[in-house]
Regions:
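EAL-type cyclic di-GMP phosphodiesterase domain
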Residues: 24-46, 71-79, 90-124, 156-176, ...
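Bacterial c-di-GMP phosphodiesterase EAL domain
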Residues: 1-91
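Glycine-rich phosphate/oxyanion-binding loops and their immediately adjacent helices
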Residues: 122-125, 140-142
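Short, well-ordered coil/turn segments that N-cap beta-strands
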Residues: 60-65, 93-98, 124-127, 149, ...
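EAL-family c-di-GMP phosphodiesterase catalytic domain
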Residues: 10-13, 103-108, 137-228
Length: 228
């Protein structure tokens, strides 16, 4: 498991750390996910959650822990969450500091099932987040039916935004919608100072990406904040 921080530039604090799957020798997510099948999907999803919580406790992770989950691996939210709740209790990690992100790694075929999971998790006290907003299923149709606590802007939507007026208009419109709905916005995949500056000027305060820190395997990476 690797960890990458999500930073709050208003006070240079850590909003959360995202747990990113890695192989036992540090192999990348693509290598690991290529070995996940329909038969081992559930056990893989459960193992990732437990591993993320165990390492978070060992590393004394500050702030929130963001965990990706696969909707197709969850058949009944109240049953599939038991191992997560038991581990959180065992390592003394408050559930209100756990943020569940809907991952884009698989095709969501049953939107009502996804909505049921998100509503159930929110009812249990977890933070809910939609990853890659603006891509695939993670768009306005989903937002119309469920308003998560957090959305993460799709990396493709913000890539080169400092020199792309169309992307600027789309992101500004998304930010306005989220303000009206009281949804927190995270810009992920930030790699350049230009992208960061453009988004900061639009009012974004939460960022994730190589500009700030690369993921660290079984560790919390040092953070580099751009000059104000």
């Amino acid at each position: 498991m690797a960890f990458q921080p999500i930073v709050d530039i208003t006070d240079r604090s850590v909003f959360a750390h995202e747990a990113l799957v890695r192989g036992v020798a540090g192999e990348g997510a693509g290598w690991v996910l290529s070995r996940v099948t329909q038969e081992n999907l559930y056990s893989f999803d459960q193992a990732c959650r437990v591993t993320a919580l165990n390492w978070s406790a060992q590393l004394q992770l500050p702030g929130r822990l963001s965990i990706n989950f696969m909707p197709n691996a969850v058949y009944k939210p109240e049953l599939c969450i038991r191992a997560t709740l038991a581990t959180a209790k065992r390592v003394n990690f408050p559930v209100e500091r756990i943020m569940f992100e809907v991952t884009e790694q698989e095709q969501v075929e049953d939107m009502e099932h996804l909505l049921q999971i998100l509503r159930s998790y929110r009812g249990m006290g977890f933070i809910t987040a939609i990853d890659d907003f603006g891509a695939a299923y993670a768009g306005l149709n989903l937002l119309a039916d469920f308003q998560p606590d957090v959305i993460k802007l799709d990396m493709h939507l913000i890539r080169g935004i400092d020199a792309d007026s169309v992307r600027q208009v789309l992101v500004e419109a998304t930010l306005q919608i989220c303000r009206r709905l009281n949804i927190t916005v995270i810009a992920e995949g930030i790699e350049t100072l230009g992208e960061y500056t453009a988004l900061r000027e639009m009012g974004v305060t939460l960022f994730q990406g190589y500009l700030f820190a690369k993921p660290a395997f079984q560790a919390l990476p040092p953070i580099s904040f751009p000059a104000q």
